[in-house]
Amino acid sequence: MENSDADHGQAAREADARRRLMEAGAASLPRAPWLHGGRPPSAADLIDFALWRAGNDDVDESVVMAALTLLPAARAEVDQAEAALMFTARARGLSWPRISRAMGLASAQAAQQRFGRVTGRVENRRGEA
């Protein structure tokens, strides 16, 4: 029960952070062609926006706090992208040695282990949702 309450609290904080960054100007950014319909910008894109604003403006601290709040969501997005890329690479017939070289890993075994860790994190997050 405590985990569920903490998850709901984090989700509410992330929603508030997204709203704050959209109000701070992220809503007017051009849409990436791969974002269909009403899909919002990624947490990573919103963090990049906050960093850009902080480097170019005297930005309100709430923008920086909102970006910090989105760091766990951005990490989750990167995990999902990494898992999807590795699935895609294997589906396209790429070998583990080639995948490991592309990712800068020491061996095929390291790539397989990383795949297991990343997909495990993604699945754990889905199970918590």
Task: Enumerate the language-model features and the residues they cover.
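Pre-recognition alpha-helix immediately N-terminal to the DNA-recognition helix
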Residues: 84-85
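Short, Lys/Arg-enriched anionic-surface-contact patches
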Residues: 3-10, 59-81, 128
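Short, Lys/Arg-rich amphipathic alpha-helical interaction segments
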Residues: 92-129
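Short alpha-helical segment immediately N-terminal to, or the first helix within
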Residues: 88-89
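General nucleic-acid-binding
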Residues: 1-58
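Charged, low-complexity, helix-prone segments enriched in Lys/Glu/Asp/Gln
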Residues: 17-25, 73-81, 118
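Amphipathic alpha-helical interaction segments
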Residues: 42-45, 66-69, 98
